Design a protein with these regions (language model features):
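Conserved catalytic Walker-motif region of ABC-type ATPase nucleotide-binding domains
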Residues: 102, 224, 312, 338-340
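Transmembrane helix-loop-helix hairpins at lipid-water interfaces of multipass membrane proteins
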Residues: 18-75, 82, 155-160, 271-275
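A hydrophobic transmembrane-helix motif
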Residues: 36-40, 64, 68-71, 136-180, ...
Length: 544
């Protein structure tokens, strides 16, 4: 349970609520056991009574039993309201922590995993952890408290029968110890299979156009069937083990009841105890049946939580390579210099850049050309400091890029990526996304500069048109131009186009470049392109 120890700070943070919950557990179990003795007294009273009529002692015992049951219900409700609520709060905080960490992860970290796996850790794994934090902890403490109170009351009633009743405890402990390890291993295997299913479904939905273009629906259905069948088999295998665990515990408790009946019967015949005492012992033991029957479920919950916490910790333990060490405010002018910059992608070992050097002054423009795979996009990623160079250094305004305030610097960067990405929102919100307080007039202005306003006004809802997931409702050229408008509306100091005019015809491309030159003055512009015509208005050209 080493991984679950990382939850200790959360327990400490919510210690007051949890402590209150534990007090309610003690109170609830006290009244559960307290009322049992009155059943025994009522049984003994009935055994002594030989005629029908009102027996006030029996009525008194029944009323006390009912009152204790009401108090038990009240404290049980309060127990759940404190412990379960605290688990929900910790779940909320843990999800926020994971999501925040996802935001801080570098691109290199993202390439090590899949979106489906990331989503699974944020949803399914956190739910498994929350089940441990709430019901898991609550039932463990409840069982312990109930066992202590019940054992004390049983010892007070008859110590010999108590020892016989507790005799199976070592057997139960051995079963729990042996099976919990198996459940832990099977849980990890099942959760890995579940992540594989989530990843496959995410990839299929994201690439549904390609699937349909190539008429591969049945191929993907066949693959999905294999993956979901594998998950089903692993889940059923785990369920069988859990069911066997549950059955074993009930079997041991059944033997225990038979033992109480035999030993209690012998002692009653010998006149050592009353029939009410036997009734009390049956009630004491059967009070433990429900908590003990949950031991298998609790063990399963805890082992699943352990496996899930390990998976979550794998990501939380990742330290981003991109670290901000400067929090000052200052002006970014836009002078850029690459000094013998090399970059090797860590996941593949591919050398994208080797000893690249160039410089560009603030307000100048640079076109970068070269064959596919020569490292043009890598330069864009380095300039945005989404990755850091393997060798060499990048200077901005004469200072190493690593020494700049990362968040301030990125606020001065306008980046139009090679792959146009739009959020599932309106056109207005997608363009205005780049600034804090966008207004429609500003949005329209930059949509016109990006030469996309004429298309937007033809839509029924114009700027309020929903673009669909990843902009699926728009053409490739429309998505590119909306992304350009989104970058321009920031009025950035440094503007980077990463082959982001490729889906446009030459006339539209020319219109956009002319508009940018007219409307955006004294900005550093870097244009990555394959087209010779796109470089005509650039001050410099770098060929890789």
């Amino acid at each position: 349970m080493k991984a679950l120890k990382t939850l200790n700070p959360y327990f400490w943070k919510h210690r007051n609520l949890l402590f209150l919950g534990f007090l309610f557990i003690i109170a609830s179990n006290f009244f559960i056991i307290y009322k049992v003795q009155f059943i025994g007294q009522a049984v003994d009273e009935l055994a002594k009574t030989s005629k029908f009529g009102v027996n006030f002692k029996i009525i008194k015992n029944v009323l006390i039993f009912i009152g204790s049951s009401l108090l038990t219900g009240l404290f049980t409700f309060m127990m759940r309201q404190t412990i379960i609520v605290s688990s929900r709060k910790i779940e909320f905080e843990l999800k926020n922590k994971i999501y925040t960490h996802y935001q801080e992860m570098s691109l290199t970290d993202y390439k090590k995993t899949t979106i489906g796996d990331l989503m699974n850790r944020l949803s399914e794994d956190v739910v498994a952890i929350r089940m441990y934090l709430g019901p898991g902890v609550m039932y463990i403490v409840n069982l312990f408290v109930l066992l202590v109170i019940t054992s004390a009351k049983m010892l007070q009633t008859d110590w010999e029968m108590t020892l016989w009743s507790l005799l199976p405890a070592p057997i139960l402990s051995l079963i729990i110890y042996k099976v919990s390890g198996v459940i832990s291993k099977k849980s990890k295997i099942m959760q890995a299979s579940q992540s594989a299913v989530s990843t496959f479904v995410t990839d299929t939905i994201s690439g549904i156009r390609v699937v349909k273009f190539f008429a591969k629906e049945f191929y993907f259905l066949d693959n999905y069937d294999k993956k979901i069948s594998d998950y089903k088999d692993k889940a059923i295998n785990l369920a069988r083990i859990e069911a066997s665990f549950f059955t074993s515990i009930l079997f041991v408790i059944g033997i225990l009841n038979a033992g109480i009946l035999y030993i209690g019967g012998q002692k009653y015949i010998d006149g050592e105890i009353s029939i009410g005492t036997i009734a009390n012992f049956f009630l004491y033991v059967n009070t433990l049946i429900w908590p003990f029957s949950l031991v298998g479920w609790i063990t399963s919950v805890n082992q699943r939580a352990e496996a899930s916490m390990q998976r979550v910790n794998e990501f939380l333990d990742m330290k981003s390579e991109i670290i901000n060490t400067n929090f000052e405010n200052y002006e970014i002018k836009g002078d850029i210099e690459f000094r013998n910059v090399s970059y090797i992608y860590p996941n593949t070992g591919i050398k994208a850049l080797e000893n690249v050097s160039f410089s560009i002054k603030s307000g100048e423009s640079l076109a970068i050309m070269g064959k596919t795979g020569c490292g043009k996009t890598t330069i864009a990623l380095l300039l945005c400091r989404l990755i850091d160079p393997t060798e060499g250094e990048i200077l901005v305004d004469g200072k190493n890029l690593k020494e700049h305030n990362l968040y301030l610097y990125r606020q001065h960067i306008g980046y139009v990526p090679q792959e146009s990405y739009l959020f599932s929102d309106t056109i207005e919100n997608n363009i205005g996304f780049a600034i804090d307080t966008p207004n429609i007039d500003t949005i329209i202005k930059y949509a016109k500069i990006a030469d996309v306003d004429k298309n937007i006004i033809e839509f029924k809802d114009q700027y309020h048109t929903m673009v669909g997931e990843r902009g699926v409702m728009l053409s490739g050229g429309q998505k590119q131009r909306i992304c350009i408008a989104r970058a321009l509306i920031k009025q950035p100091t440094i503007l980077i186009f990463d082959d982001s005019l490729s889906a446009l015809d030459s006339q539209t491309e020319s219109n956009i470049i002319n508009n940018i030159n007219e409307e955006i003055k004294n900005k550093t512009i870097i244009l990555i392109t394959h087209r010779e015509s796109s470089t005509e208005r650039m001050d410099r050209i770098l060929k890789l």
